């Protein structure tokens, strides 16, 4: 029976991963987070050992459980672009500095470290598909703090790789725009405070206009969370050590759409649901600049598509969900929350 340590267990990936582990395996989950709102009843499962805490404070608990568990997933990170621009030091301190002692504990106790890199590490790479073995990692100038997240993650990737040269059993995985229920809160009216799909859904729920940054031409390969978790489960299982010392892109190249196309898809799908259809009719698409939306420290990536051949072949995995199916699941999940989210408009 595997013991899996998930730090950030209440986060988007953490709670979906915990659910899959508890439903489909006999593994035990040891989880830490500061809240349980996404976990809900999972926090009370007999194989879920939850501790309410903070990786920057409860360091002894973390080290003890790194020693106790077989597989370590440090999922705690800030991953919202608006924060990269406005609070770059906060991003670096949490995403790199706070996670480094956890990496070193995995080295110390000889554990399998499964670390969340990011599709952002590829930066403004010009390749049609981003290759974890060969693509260049290219960023903008220092006066664009938007790149602090990508730099922090890339530096950690390189540190982990270095420890791998000295014997650390590790796997780096790079999620490409994973989407699904629980990504961010639809209750947040402030633009830029959540990631694009949740932001757009919140606007649709409240009948607000959707801002397309720089026209919404930038494209992303969106990935259903259940597909992403499927690959992650294979990595944690690590049958015959297949994932050891590897870097995997986890994404769906066929779901490559522009942000403008995403907005149109979501508005079309909203008409299938009575809870969303009336407010969706009020929504207009308006164009804005990245400077006005995020601040002058922002730069964008125009295309971000993963090369996933090694992920598919080595893990025996393939993404299944179409873009419409992935979005429809999100609309379904939030149907019961629409009334509460609308109150934000009435109160403002």
Regions found by a protein language model. Give the residues of each.
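N-terminal Rossmann NAD(P)H-binding glycine-rich loop of SDR-like oxidoreductase domains
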Residues: 4-24
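A conserved pocket-lining segment of Rossmann-fold NAD(P)-dependent short-chain dehydrogenase/reductase
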Residues: 84, 137-144, 170, 176-189, ...
């Amino acid at each position: 029976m595997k013991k899996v340590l998930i730090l950030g267990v209440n986060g988007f990936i953490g709670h979906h991963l915990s659910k899959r582990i508890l439903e489909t395996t006999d593994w035990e989950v040891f989880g830490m987070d500061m809240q349980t709102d996404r976990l809900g009843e999972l926090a009370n499962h007999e194989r879920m050992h939850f501790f309410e805490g903070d990786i920057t404070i409860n360091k002894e608990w973390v080290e003890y459980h790194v020693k106790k568990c077989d597989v370590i997933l440090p999922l705690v990170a800030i991953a919202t672009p608006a924060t990269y621009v406005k609070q770059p030091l906060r991003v670096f301190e949490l995403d790199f500095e706070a996670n480094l002692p956890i990496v070193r504990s995995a080295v110390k106790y000889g554990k399998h470290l499964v670390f969340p890199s990011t599709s952002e590490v590829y930066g403004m790479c010009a390749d049609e598909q981003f290759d974890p073995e060969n693509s260049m990692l290219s960023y903008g100038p220092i006066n664009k703090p938007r790149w602090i997240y990508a730099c922090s993650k890339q530096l950690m990737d390189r540190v982990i790789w270095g420890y791998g040269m000295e014997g650390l059993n590790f796997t780096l995985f790079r999620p490409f725009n994973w989407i699904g229920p629980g990504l961010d809160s639809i209750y947040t009216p402030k633009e830029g405070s959540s990631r694009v799909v949740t932001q757009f859904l919140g606007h649709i729920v409240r009948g607000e206009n959707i801002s397309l940054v720089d026209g919404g031409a930038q494209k992303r390969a969106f990935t259903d969370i259940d597909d992403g978790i499927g690959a992650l489960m294979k990595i944690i299982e690590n049958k015959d050590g297949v994932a050891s010392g590897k870097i995997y892109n986890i994404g769906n190249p066929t779901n490559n759409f522009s942000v403008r196309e995403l907005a149109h898809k979501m508005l079309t799908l909203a008409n299938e649901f009575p809870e969303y259809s009336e407010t969706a009719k009020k929504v207009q698409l308006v164009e804005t600049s990245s400077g006005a939306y995020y601040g002058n420290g922002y730069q964008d990536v125009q295309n971000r598509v993963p090369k996933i051949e090694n992920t598919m072949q080595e893990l025996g995995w393939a993404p299944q969900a179409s873009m419409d199916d992935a979005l429809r699941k999100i609309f379904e999940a939030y149907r019961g929350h629409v009334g509460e989210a609308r109150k934000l408009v009435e109160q403002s």
